């Protein structure tokens, strides 16, 4: 069976983001259709790729079994990656994962995928131009200090243009599962990287570091710790909820 351009787009997405729900595929590729039609078209596409052995879904579902086929969580198979390599030999093969991801890991990965979805929707609606979006590990940054070598591991990186302005972001998807002390420690890694000047020399600007959190309670707690523990460096960071994300990206949120 011949693959379409959209088939390859879905395979490429799953190779980059690791996991995506049917709903997220609908939002990315079928927004021009009415909801029922969009879901049906997404189901047909995933069924085709599933039957070809190029993708598969986890046993668990978003919303449980009663949510139907629209609740599946999809991932690319080894065969799917090999298919992608036919058009892009630079893509690396990965070892098969024998086990399903933990609940927290999966929730985190889908959160990062949703950040990408939100940006693509803004791009499609011509609210901004998404120049680049990198998932892990492509968004990682390696650097050295006087004492050691480090790898900064953002959850994602994005570069976008709004009007005549170019913005860049490191994103951290926070599900309120990490102790605040570990979050602050991650912030200090960003500060260490900022102080190397590497990003500024290569790209002229240092990306805004955005922590995206599930609710206002977590937002207030994280903002307070950042201001208390990071001295003047707190200005490198913003903390928002996912509901605030679209408005924030468009410049509608105060610092």
Per-segment meaning from a language model:
Residues 1-100:
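Nuclease-adjacent, charged terminal/linker segments that flank catalytic cores
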Residues 4, 35, 39, 105, ...:
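Flexible, glycine- and charge-enriched loops at secondary-structure boundaries
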Residues 29, 46-50, 115-123, 190-198, ...:
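Hydrophobic, Leu/Ile/Phe/Ala-enriched alpha-helical segments that form helix-helix packing faces
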Residues 82-132:
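Amphipathic alpha-helical dimerization/coiled-coil segments
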Residues 118, 128-169, 178-185:
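Active-site metal-binding core of divalent-cation-utilizing nuclease and nuclease-like domains
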Residues 156-255:
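C-terminal regulatory/effector modules of DNA-binding transcriptional regulators
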